[in-house]
């Protein structure tokens, strides 16, 4: 069963202010901007314009549109597992062991592997 809810806050375009918030549904406590505190040795701000968020398996996937990145973290702890750089990434979906992303960078000639986390 779920014990909480992640909220990806978009932030203002051009300000590098996207944040990840968390609502603990067992206590009702809402925590703002948890990503830097969960990743003290690595993380700064999440990036510019949080656009999409999904939990798939044990991972939390966050699309940071204007930063051209998909950030991947542990769904249980929000600790960063890595990221994949994708120009103008917008949305993501999953099927089996693959994540599919949309991008408005231009035409695509076929599927390609952009990264692995």
Q: What spans do the regions from the language model cover?
A:
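Repeated scaffold domains used in trafficking and secretory/extracellular systems
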Residues: 43-52, 86-97
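Structural recognition of the beta-propeller blade-terminating site
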Residues: 24, 72-74
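A short beta-strand motif characteristic of beta-propeller blades
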Residues: 29-45, 76-84
